[in-house]
Amino acid sequence: MKKITIAIDGFSSCGKSTMAKDLAREVGYIYIDSGAMYRAVTLYSIENGIFNGDVIDTEKLKEAIRDIRITFRPNPETGRPDTYLNGVNVENKIRTMGVSSKVSPISALDFVREAMVAQQQAMGKEKGIVMDGRDIGTTVFPDAELKIFVTATPEIRAQRRFDELKAKGQEGSFEEILENVKQRDYIDQHREVSPLRKADDALLLDNSNLSIEQQKEWLSEQFGKVVKE
């Protein structure tokens, strides 16, 4: 069976990572969370004084980005990969609201996207990968054999994020999360470099009212169709 590249793009908190991880595990592919890479750069920026309030010291980050290396290693307890920033596990740190509120302006910077896209393309050279993000099917792997674009209503996505934070024992109000979701949608769709959009050849999946099992079944079906071609 031929190996392919699978690109899953879509809005924040619409379950891209969960479905990408599950699909990768099911078909024996490597999963790469591109969103986690931008979150890791954001965390680095927060921890290294690159933010002054909401203002980014772009010159300082431009100098630092050359030495920022993001990798993924399997976590035997979860069965899924954790994110490492320069060799340090930051999986839990990058999922906080503090990082969520600052990740969109960081990921909108052209030199940050250029650096991350280069790392992502290096990871996917041999195919056999599932990568999710905002511009995987349009910019990172425009020739991916299977492209999915995922969407859901802002309210449903905010509720999912709220439930996820609550399960991890982290605080956050639903209203604050909903506002963050809407802000990120706007920034992601209107940035100058690689804005969020559905690739012309991507399949659309609105999972507002789908269970995880229904999603899995649909994704498996699409994967099967492509690898048999």
Swiss-Prot record:
The keyword Transmembrane helix does not apply. Its EC number is 2.7.4.25. Its main location: cytoplasm. SUPFAM superfamilies: P-loop containing nucleoside triphosphate hydrolases. This is Cytidylate kinase. One of its GO terms (molecular function) is dCMP kinase activity. It catalyses: CMP + ATP = CDP + ADP; dCMP + ATP = dCDP + ADP. GO terms for biological process: nucleobase-containing small molecule interconversion; pyrimidine nucleotide metabolic process. Gene3D superfamilies: P-loop containing nucleotide triphosphate hydrolases. Keywords: ATP-binding, Cytoplasm, Kinase, Nucleotide-binding, Transferase. Belongs to the cytidylate kinase family. Type 1 subfamily. It is an enzyme of class 2 (transferase). It comes from Bacteroides thetaiotaomicron (strain ATCC 29148 / DSM 2079 / JCM 5827 / CCUG 10774 / NCTC 10582 / VPI-5482 / E50). Pfam families: Cytidylate_kin. GO terms for cellular component: cytosol. ATP binds at residues 10-18.
